[in-house]
């Protein structure tokens, strides 16, 4: 489990991408990802879904560019170009994959199609949003309403956040709303933040303890000599959890649990369970999912028909927001029908001219 956590911490870039959605006046959409691909994928021009968070299938148009350069080139990258870039990167002690941005773009006819094609692989989880779109036509204007929602993942955790946070505290800690510090001094605001940070650390430790504890109970028959009776072990649940939270905090997933439990119970009877990858697989998966979600960052931009040159929405979707609630990215836009105003003006002018002609004839 420690190795798994260390590996996840070393690949934070694997859970970071850019995502741009453009809503067109005809009600169709364009979606574009900004990705980091390794050298093998750059040269082959084939995206390997097993290596990437963004899962691509279907007719995506792939291009690449050097960071800071607006010129895009078709993927795959030819080997000579790659070698030249690799040499430049060696001189600056960087990597080609950290210097190149790959764009994957695709056009969609409906909100259903774009939602179906959006899949983010985060740990063992696959995140798929619900997307709704409404286009309302009126004589003077057309209104567009777009909403993309990523579902809450609180059911993934053994200990609910409500045991450590109020509803408002959850909102503030994970999304910034409501703002609990707006009327406070800097020192008062810091006190609030430090208190919530401590509660968050306790919640992390409580979850890690609970899933580990349940795994031990499920495999209790495989405990070694010196193990307590199962009834005695159950009776120590609250005491062990309190000790685990106090000692581990936010670093719970990095703990050597076998050593910790040996010190608590003065026996290594549970070491064989805690060190068995098969018996602890569910624990490892949930820890990995939590860490992957904590690293998830999607730089999101939404362009609406009325704001073709500037994004109507520019934000960062963090995976940690999904611990407490769903994350909704939305915007609306109204496009005026210039021709209707021209038509009305022409009608009024025609009526005025007609009235003048009638009066002149009299």
Predicted feature descriptions by range:
Residues 350-362:
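Juxtamembrane interface at the cytosolic side of transmembrane helices
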Residues 34, 46-48, 317, 346-350:
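General N-terminal targeting signals
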Residues 62-346:
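Mature, soluble, non-transmembrane domains
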Residues 7-10:
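C-terminal motif of bacterial Sec signal peptides marking the signal peptidase cleavage site
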Residues 51-53, 123-126, 350:
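Short, low-complexity, polar/charged sequence segments that are solvent-exposed and flexible
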Residues 12-84:
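Start-of-domain marker
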């Amino acid at each position: 489990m420690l190795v798994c956590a260390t590996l996840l911490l070393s690949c934070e870039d694997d859970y970071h991408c850019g995502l741009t959605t453009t809503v067109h006046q005809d009600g169709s959409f364009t979606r574009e990802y900004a990705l980091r691909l390794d050298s093998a994928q750059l040269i082959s021009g084939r995206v390997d879904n097993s290596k990437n968070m963004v899962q691509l299938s279907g007719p995506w148009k792939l291009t690449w560019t050097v960071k800071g350069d607006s010129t895009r080139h078709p993927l795959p990258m030819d080997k000579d170009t790659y070698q030249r870039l690799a040499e430049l990167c060696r001189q600056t002690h960087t990597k080609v994959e950290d210097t190149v941005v790959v764009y994957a773009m695709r056009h969609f006819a409906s909100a259903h199609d774009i939602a179906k094609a959006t899949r983010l692989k985060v740990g063992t989880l696959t995140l798929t949003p619900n997307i709704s779109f409404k286009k309302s036509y009126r004589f003077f204007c057309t209104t567009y309403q777009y909403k993309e929602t990523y579902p809450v993942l609180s059911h993934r955790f053994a200990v609910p956040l409500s045991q450590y946070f109020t509803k408002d505290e959850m909102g503030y800690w994970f999304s910034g709303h409501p703002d609990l510090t707006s009327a406070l001094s800097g020192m008062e605001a810091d006190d609030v933040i430090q208190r919530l940070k401590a509660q968050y650390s306790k919640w992390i430790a409580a979850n890690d303890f609970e899933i580990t504890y349940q795994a031990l109970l499920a495999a209790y028959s495989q405990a070694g000599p010196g193990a307590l009776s199962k009834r005695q072990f159950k009776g120590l649940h609250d005491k062990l959890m309190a000790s685990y939270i106090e000692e581990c905090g936010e670093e719970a997933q990095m703990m050597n649990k076998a050593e910790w439990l040996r010190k608590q119970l003065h026996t290594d009877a549970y070491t064989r369970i805690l060190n068995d990858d098969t018996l602890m697989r569910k624990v490892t998966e949930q820890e990995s999912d939590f860490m992957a979600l904590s690293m998830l960052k999607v730089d999101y931009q939404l362009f609406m028909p009325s704001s073709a040159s500037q994004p109507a929405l520019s934000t960062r979707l963090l995976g940690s927001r999904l611990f407490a609630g769903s994350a909704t990215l939305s915007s609306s836009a109204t496009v005026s029908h210039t021709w209707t105003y021209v038509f009305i003006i022409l009608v009024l002018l025609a009526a005025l001219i007609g009235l003048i002609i009638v009066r002149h004839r009299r």
